[in-house]
Amino acid sequence: FDLANYYSMHPVLLDEHFRSLPPIINYSNKEFYGGRIKVMRRNDNSKKVLETVVVPDGKVDFDATRNLPEIEALVKRLHEIVIEDERKNPDNPVSIGIISPFRAQVEQLKISVSKVLSEHMMEKHQIEIGTAHTFQGDERDIILISWAYANNSFPQSLIFLQKPNLFNVAITRARYQMINFISKDPRELPEGILRSYLGFVEEYENRFALS
């Protein structure tokens, strides 16, 4: 069905949006809100704010809800972000959120992150790890999303992670930067909002590379 029309019949938002840089909110504005949001922040063209990391060796485990290679790639990137921020910005640290649609992936992410970052560093950077439900009404400077979807994922997993309301929450929590992790070429995904969204991200990345 037409998501834009659905949400236009169920008004739940203020028209002005102050949280996210335009590239982060633009997809949601078009797909879910019919372009009714007025984005109040200006573009920051000096830094890539949308990104997709494809994990080529990623695969889900027996219950199709944990993807350890994807977790490893995300935690490595998280560690790099924190180290760079501590070097450049020690007195005003960025806040970081980590989202996955699947509870088992979230729990494994918590374990893996705790092995890399101290409790002090997690508190300093306000690191929260959870599903989209965890982040409803919340936001962070940087969001990393583990979609935990791979070539061996069950089709039902894709149906679950594409629930419109939760998908919309997940992709709109970041203020400055949004990094997606997935273990399947987005262009090989079935038609749906995940493929559409990651295609939007790819188009943004291509434009940014030429700017």
Question: Locations of the language-model features?
Answer:
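Conserved coupling/interface region of RecA-like P-loop/ASCE motor cores
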Residues: 1-42, 101-103, 183-187
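Helicase C-terminal subdomain and adjacent C-terminal extension
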Residues: 1-12, 29, 152-211
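Short glycine-/polar-rich loops that comprise or flank the Walker A/P-loop
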Residues: 6-11, 48-50, 125, 139-142, ...
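Amphipathic alpha-helical transducer elements in NTP-driven molecular machines
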Residues: 18-21, 25, 71, 75, ...
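Conserved helicase/translocase motor-coupling segment
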Residues: 35-114
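Conserved RecA-like helicase motor-core motifs
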Residues: 97, 114-131
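Conserved helicase motor
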Residues: 102-103, 129-135
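A short beta-strand element within the Helicase C-terminal
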Residues: 130, 138-150, 169, 177-180
